[in-house]
Amino acid sequence: MIHEPFNYDDIKLMSVELPDSLKSLRYAGRYKEELDEIERLLDPNTFPKFDPIMEARLKLERYFAWGLMNDYRTTEEEMIALIAEKHPGFGKENLTDIINTGHADYLLTAEGLRFHKDAGANILGGRCAKYLWEFDHPGETYTPSIGENENIRIQKETGFHAYNFTVNMWIKPDAAHEREGKILRAWLPFPCECEEQSDIKLLSVSHPNYIVSNAGTRTVYAEFPYHKGEKFEITFSFTNTARYKELSFDAARNDVPPQLRVFTEEYEPHIIFTPYLKKLAAYLMGSETNHLKIARRFYDYVTNHVKYSFMREYRLFDNIPMYAAVNGRGDCGVMALLFVTLCRIAGIPARWQSGNACNPSRVASHDWAKFYVEPWGWLHADCSYGGSALRNGDLESWNWLFGNFDPFRFIACEAFQTEAEPKKKFMRLDPYDNQTGEIEYEDEWLTFSDIDAYKGIVEAHRVL
């Protein structure tokens, strides 16, 4: 698998049914046996002999089983001990409480309950702030602080809010995967040319003969013979402008330009109009026909129903929107895809937008959605920020994040699930998004566990 090239279009085959033997092993959490069964089924002498489509699906399942086997290793005892270091007295019943609130990513495997390797950091990193604070302060009630939202005030007063950022990013193999003299191929996210961003400048690149793409997933690319300790590094600047849009249900029109109808269609394997999601959309819509009101109902549903939680790598999901709807948890991208899919089912053009959240001190991965309603055109919907605002009692921000947004974003992806440019030879680190970058040797696949990466703010200032 490490040395086997991957056809990017095969990612769409995640929606193809698996043989019963594999489904049984996967759902039993017996991933090593599932990998062995995949190899048995791929043997040309095995009955039944599969067509090339199913063979490609089985090879794709390798990545799925391998990822789950390697990423879910933390035991229940290890998770309790990790949290108890920061919160003495934390025990099994407390972990059960957190599991039941949807904030712990776990699987039942052949070895028992296993948590994702980053689940502890997710719990301790603020997603369970209320529970852990009240655990440490028995009898007291946690009250989140709500400060003045300066972004909303500025946009309402001036009509826009703009920020210029200078960002530095780099990516490299970690020490265990340095291959002296081998050709390394590297892609780093770069700001898209879109309505929100302007004054885009590539200030420096560590290696010559680089390529700046204009694909839906925009990157700076270079390939070079690798030397120990070397990094592929870029520095760039851009201005992001958020323009105030005052929405009115009465002013909304349902016109959809013909060129935007592609944004009302399915896109395998995740933006799929499953029977459940179609029924859910119909239930939420009721008899309503106004596109803006319908989109608002979908936004309200996602922000109320889906709690923010760290997620495994997106390539380890069969259907992301279904996961969000059925499990009631997900991260920013999971929520965005559920909103996008519901809108498309209703005939409302909707799309993905992503990259990173930026503020004057840090850069962090972030995804959100856009939807189209006349006469305003493309509008933003940030379901994860909106859901957090709702749970904190910040109704002003919750309402604002339906239709409007802030300038504290670096947009690198204007589309979900688009090929890298130039194409990768091996499986993408993230086949659907690009927030940290991609890297591979000419003859070897590298995973997230095999790389080191950095992204940070060099300078930031408001543009008047």
Task: Annotate each predicted stretch with a short phrase.
Residues 27, 40-244:
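Intrinsically disordered, low-complexity N-terminal segments that are enriched in acidic
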Residues 15-28, 334-424:
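Hydrophobic/aromatic-rich core segments of domains that either
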Residues 403-464:
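Low-complexity, Gly/Ser/Thr/Pro-rich intrinsically disordered linker/tail segments
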Residues 2-17:
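TPR-adjacent "capping" and linker segments in tetratricopeptide-repeat scaffold/adaptor proteins
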Residues 31-41:
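Solenoid-repeat scaffolds in large eukaryotic assemblies
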Residues 18-19, 26-33, 214-216, 228-326:
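Acidic low-complexity segments
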Residues 291-298, 328-343:
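Active-site nucleophilic cysteine motif
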Residues 186, 298, 369:
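Terminal peptide-recognition signature
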